[in-house]
């Protein structure tokens, strides 16, 4: 999200979900701020509902997961960047410099917090969708990318390119079939990536029952913290007069119902 007059085209891919605020000649970066906004929460739920294409006539493959190996990979990098900045400059400085951006001390601390909340939400959500067993494939363990809404491992993107060059993929029909095949395997590819991520994050050697319960507990704590931050943002919008009281109350009621999904198993 950008505010003010930006004098150039910033590249903030390594610090996703951030605010950019131009003030005179200074570009302030607020990392991860958009993770806790009403706007993001609504978008997460709005875009899948707006896809009115008939199930049998969807020419484009669009994956609506807002937290995926693609976005979470960037969040991991963003969190590491912020931690490295803090390590290099110390915790008592008023601002940090990252390329051409200025990050306030409080913004950096909150950015690390918000990114960590997102990571824990992602890990818990994945465990709700897949049994905690060792992956059956190595596809997906590397970096991920996005092709017009199709989320896929970079290795699969490269395989598409190689097969087009070799003639294995000759027509647009062949290409669409490959896209659909990759999308059909998304859950397993995602699990291959997520399994390793969970082990690395927690320092586990395997996903024992005790370890799984710890991840799930952290997921619930993080999700409630996320909802609490969104409530704060909604209250701010209401105080500024941006929304009517009835809309504000209905939105809060919707957020209160989020606890119903905490322990829901989806596999």
Where are these regions (language model features)?
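Charge-dense, extended regions
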Residues: 165-267
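Glycine-rich hexapeptide-repeat left-handed beta-helix
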Residues: 1-79
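Extended alpha-helical scaffolding regions
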Residues: 46-133
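Acidic, low-complexity intrinsically disordered regions
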Residues: 43, 62, 140, 187-189, ...
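Short linear interaction motif-like sites in intrinsically disordered regions of transcription factors
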Residues: 48, 67, 145, 192-194, ...
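Extended alpha-helical coiled-coil/bundle linker/stalk regions that scaffold oligomerization
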Residues: 98-190
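Short, isolated positions within intrinsically disordered regulatory regions of eukaryotic proteins
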Residues: 51, 70, 148, 195-197, ...
